């Protein structure tokens, strides 16, 4: 009888944890290390308006495609 009660308790506890997520010291989300975003090569083929300053600098240094105000790419 004790075995049945114990098994029922464990089964119900497992269902509760599975449905809601147990809140304990070992179940918190794992923090990921900061990773620098990689500028894709496709960003350099877009107009200068659609990319960030970092992407524009990267395109200019890597490919020689430099953005100029109101002119788009040159080079």
Curated annotation (Swiss-Prot):
Q: Which UniProt keywords apply?
A: Amidation, Antibiotic, Antimicrobial, Chitin-binding, Disulfide bond, Fungicide, Pyrrolidone carboxylic acid, Signal
Q: InterPro entries annotated for this entry?
A: Penaeidin
Which sequence positions carry the modification called Pyrrolidone carboxylic acid?
Answer: 20
Question: Which cysteine pairs make disulfide bonds?
Answer: 44-59, 48-66, 60-67
**Which Pfam families does its entry note?**
Penaeidin (PF05927)
Q: What does this protein do?
A: Antibacterial and antifungal activity. Presents chitin-binding activity.
| Name this protein carries in UniProt | Penaeidin-3m
- What is the phylogenetic placement of the source species in the record? Eukaryota, Metazoa, Ecdysozoa, Arthropoda, Crustacea
């Amino acid at each position: 009888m004790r075995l049945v009660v114990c098994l029922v308790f464990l089964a119900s506890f497992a269902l509760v944890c599975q449905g809601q997520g147990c809140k304990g010291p070992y179940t918190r989300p794992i923090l990921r290390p900061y990773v620098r975003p990689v500028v894709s090569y496709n960003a350099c083929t877009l107009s200068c308006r659609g990319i960030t300053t970092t992407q524009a600098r990267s395109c200019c240094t890597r490919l020689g495609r430099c953005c100029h105000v109101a002119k788009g790419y040159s080079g």
